[in-house]
Amino acid sequence: MNKWLNQFFKEIEKEKYDNTVMPKMWDILNEISEKTGFDEHRILMLSLYGSQNYRMNNENSDIDTECFIFPSHDDIIYARSLFSKCIETQYGTCHVKDIRAAFNELRKSSPNILEILASPYMIINREYYFLMKQMCCDYINYIATLNLYKLMRGLDGLYNKYRSEMNASNKAYANMLRIENMMTSVLLKEDYTKELIPHNYISLKAIKYSDKIDTELREKTENGYSAVLRANVNKFYDRLETDSDEKVLGTINFWQSELMDKYIRLEL
């Protein structure tokens, strides 16, 4: 490991089930720094994105990541477009983006950004570790469920995407069932983030990597549980207030202000 990495960055303190992931994450962080020229003054964190997060990977799965960076002084002064670039690493794809983009996604209650921030596989800049640990560990379920309407809409969109592909792809079908778990946890008012790793991940993984497509099972899903879920989701929308944006914006703006204020004090 590059010495500067260990000096300036730290793994998040969360339980991890796969000890092979984090050494590769450190390699990715070093590779991203070399390819972008960003160092500890610009890089906030690196987090895992994809199948390892929900235990549906195998030995051939890519390790895809997201790396959040701070804007430069000129980026802020001249209101430049938010930095965003996909970089191929030795293990997969890393999407490097301005941390302000992550907060924009949080304001929409995007399931994708929530997965990234809730990941147990994360490396954080030591200067911001306590603040990010609070956000990504202590308050992540609170943040995720601030606007249940938007959260469910986001999950609903993912669910329908995978549902439309399920007859042609075992991966899509397994992911559709994974999203069902998450939608059900919202409907039952349970801890949403616990289903980021599905309780039935073993059976979902078996479906994902099966050599054949079980059309009969898909028909049962389409006519059975999917129909019941759809009815309950529609009732959920009818009952739910949709005017909670002010509460969401206040909370997300607070976290963004805390982070950016500290960055400006330290670096600018």
Which residue ranges define each predicted feature?
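Aromatic-acidic/polar surface patches that form glycan- and anion
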Residues: Y17-M22, H95, E165-A172
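Ligand-binding pocket scaffold of soluble enzyme catalytic domains
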Residues: T20, K24, E34-G37, R42-L44, ...
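A structural signal for short, well-ordered beta-strand segments and their strand-loop junctions
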Residues: M45-L48, E115-I116, S185-L188
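Generic structural signal for hydrophobic core residues of well-folded globular domains
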Residues: I69, L106, E180-L187, Y263, ...
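A basic- and aromatic-enriched beta-loop-alpha substructure that forms the phosphate/nucleotide-
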Residues: I76-L158
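Conserved nucleotidyltransferase catalytic core and NTase-mimicking acidic/glycine-rich helix/loop elements
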Residues: I124-D261
